[in-house]
């Protein structure tokens, strides 16, 4: 009997894994009565800040409260289908970008095969709107295949016209440094007063943003940026921590245009905030939802009171290398 139970358990476990592996990404479809007909693709892939937790949560908000169809992609183990943020060379489902009206990316030092990366390149050439979160300033790092036609996107590229790679040329900045003390200081978001007086749609209803991740350093942003939010370091990692007056402020959220050679002009929204625990801040979630509307030409619909309530349970894992929850498959984040 014990042998039969063991065999049955093994078969059941194998069937469950096969079922999970059959779903390499997750899609949320809105009710027909609330669907706006638009598709947002969210791409996770970072080793530290738990994008694999944050993006499904944002996708559920966009679908449930705002009528977007959403698809979430993950860095996975190609053999098992298990989520593995440390695998920098594989994100299944990039072809979903072909039907995307907007993409939200949360990437760090990825080097995807050309067969996957070509969909992202086509997306940019089409001039489609893009949101980049936290480490997406240094989304790509080409080391194994420097001859790839997409190696120009590498964060440390020095080629004329592509200095700073994707981060600087498309989002406005690449990786510079930690302006705040990583792991001991948080970020207090300060809304830009001029943009607020101009009633910029992205910051409508946004006033109270704090997150435990530290402020990233930046230089003068590339292109034609409009800074919407500045970051002030806090002397501690709790929402009531006082600001560190010895630290200057840095831009932490902005918009800008972009255009790759041979492509159409597009718009981006970038923020250097965005870990899974940062998104416990209601107004940070609102910032992303507002940016989604604005980039899709729906800024007039934003009044700052739209729901950004989390759908279902959300217990984000604290950021840290190697600390992602093991044994998870995309379907576990439905």
Residue ranges of each PLM-predicted region?
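Sec/Tat signal peptide C-region and signal peptidase I cleavage site
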Residues: 15-17
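Active-site rim elements
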Residues: 45-48, 180, 184-191, 203, ...
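Extracellular ligand-binding/catalytic regions of CAZymes and related secreted enzymes
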Residues: 20-35, 53-54, 61-65, 235-334
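Helical hinge/lid and interdomain linker segments adjacent to catalytic or ligand-binding clefts
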Residues: 26-29, 41-43, 47-140
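Bacterial N-terminal signal peptides
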Residues: 1-13
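Stable alpha-helical elements in mature extracytoplasmic
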Residues: 36, 54, 58, 96, ...
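Residue-level preference for short coil/turn positions at secondary-structure junctions
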Residues: 35-36, 98-99, 126, 198, ...
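An acidic, glycine-rich "communication" segment
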Residues: 36, 133-239, 304-334
């Amino acid at each position: 009997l014990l042998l039969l139970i063991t065999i049955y358990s093994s078969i059941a476990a194998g069937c469950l894994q096969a079922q999970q592996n059959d779903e390499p990404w997750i899609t949320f479809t809105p009710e027909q009565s609330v669907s706006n007909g638009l598709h947002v693709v969210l791409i996770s892939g970072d080793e530290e800040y738990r994008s694999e937790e944050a993006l499904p949560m944002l996708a559920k908000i966009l679908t449930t409260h705002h009528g977007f169809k959403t698809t979430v992609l993950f860095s996975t183990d190609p053999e098992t289908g298990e989520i593995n943020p440390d695998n920098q060379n594989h994100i299944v489902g990039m072809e979903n970008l072909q039907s995307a009206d907007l993409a939200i990316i949360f990437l760090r030092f990825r080097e995807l095969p050309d067969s996957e990366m070509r969909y992202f390149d086509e997306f940019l050439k089409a001039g489609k709107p893009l949101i980049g979160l936290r480490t997406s300033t240094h989304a790509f790092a080409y080391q194994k295949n420097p001859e790839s036609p997409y190696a120009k996107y590498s964060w440390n590229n020095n080629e004329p016209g592509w200095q700073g790679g994707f981060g600087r040329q498309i989002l406005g900045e690449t990786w510079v440094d930690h302006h705040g003390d990583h792991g001991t200081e948080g970020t207090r978001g300060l809304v830009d007063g001029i943009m607020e007086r101009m009633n910029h749609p992205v910051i409508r209803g946004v006033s109270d943003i704090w997150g435990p991740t530290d402020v990233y350093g930046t230089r003068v942003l590339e292109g034609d940026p409009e800074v919407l939010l500045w970051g002030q370091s806090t002397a501690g990692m709790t929402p009531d921590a006082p600001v560190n007056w010895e630290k200057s402020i840095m831009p932490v959220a902005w918009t800008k245009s972009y255009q790759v050679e041979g492509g159409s002009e597009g718009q981006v929204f970038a923020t250097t905030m965005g870990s899974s625990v940062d998104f416990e801040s209601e107004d940070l979630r609102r910032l992303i939802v507002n940016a989604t509307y604005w980039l899709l030409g729906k800024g007039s619909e934003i009044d700052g009171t739209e729901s950004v309530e989390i759908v279902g349970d959300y217990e984000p894992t604290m950021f840290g290398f190697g600390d992602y929850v093991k044994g998870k498959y995309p379907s576990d984040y439905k």
